[in-house]
Amino acid sequence: MVQVRAAHPTNQDGSVNIDAWIARIGERTQLVDPQILHEACEWAQGLEQAAIDAENIWADGASSYRTGLEMAEILADLKLDQDSLVAAVVYRAVRERKTDLTEVEHRFGPTVTHLVDGVQRMAAISVSQNPGNTASFSPQAQVENLRKMLVTLVDDVRVALI
């Protein structure tokens, strides 16, 4: 397999070295307040650990936390803003119901919450197109989700990029 992106910098215990990772992100895009991104990383990491402890994992061998970091790295390469990076880091935790939008808004504000909500709406469209998924929505709900997704995209194109 070809590796296009460098592995996350790690500590001796194998955990992601958040400070080194943020420094690497800061080389790619401007961070207004790196501490906010640091807080998002620590929070997402803690939520994932709590889910692991409760045996509520996304998929064997997969890490929703590291997936969020990967998403943020791609967005940093595209020079997206800090709010987009924070939204990418915490999105999987919301999607996997390890937390909710109310808590995201409390911690990171309305802009990050708006982005995460918009990405969730887009994800709902793909879920609704999978007929084998028991979480599928009714046709009316699918239409409403599509309408909301399009409104969100018109409002903020960062949603599509995340």
What annotation goes with each model-predicted range?
Residues 1-162:
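Active-site helical microenvironments for divalent-metal-assisted chemistry
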